[in-house]
Amino acid sequence: MARIAGVNIPTAKRVVIALTYIHGIGPKFAQEIVAKVGIPAERRVHQLTDAEVLQIREAIDRDYQVEGDLRRDTAMNIKRLMDLGCYRGLRHRRGLPVRGQRTHTNARTRKGPAKAIAGKKK
């Protein structure tokens, strides 16, 4: 298994697909990286030479924010909103939907399981 950006990527898959296992790299960025490095898109990970893996690793380190750095930045952005006390920060703090979705019904994923109300029957 090749290890890129702290992630063991699967060896049997094509390089473009395998790169998407890294947090922060989707299909579009994976194709960009492969094109920059000059590797054929249909090549599998186990067919890559050590030099090609090193080129991919350097391209990702140089041009993209991935894995821990990306997760930390996302968490810091949310924390900043919460510290500001703006509407989005309050919604994050209360564990409610942030982007204007309705909460009267639905929003169960964000709010968690429904709480039983004593004495309420159909």
Curated annotation (Swiss-Prot):
Keyword field contains Amino-acid biosynthesis: no
Pfam family, one: Ribosomal_S13
Sequence segments annotated as region (Disordered): 99-122
Superkingdom to which the source organism belongs: Bacteria
UniProt-recorded Gene Ontology molecular function terms: rRNA binding; structural constituent of ribosome; tRNA binding
Keyword annotations: Ribonucleoprotein, Ribosomal protein, RNA-binding, rRNA-binding, tRNA-binding
Listed GO CC annotations: cytosol; small ribosomal subunit
GO BP annotation list: translation
Quaternary structure note: Part of the 30S ribosomal subunit. Forms a loose heterodimer with protein S19. Forms two bridges to the 50S subunit in the 70S ribosome.
NCBIfam families, sorted: uS13_bact
Family: Belongs to the universal ribosomal protein uS13 family.
Function, in words: Located at the top of the head of the 30S subunit, it contacts several helices of the 16S rRNA. In the 70S ribosome it contacts the 23S rRNA (bridge B1a) and protein L5 of the 50S subunit (bridge B1b), connecting the 2 subunits; these bridges are implicated in subunit movement. Contacts the tRNAs in the A and P-sites.
Name recorded for this polypeptide: Small ribosomal subunit protein uS13
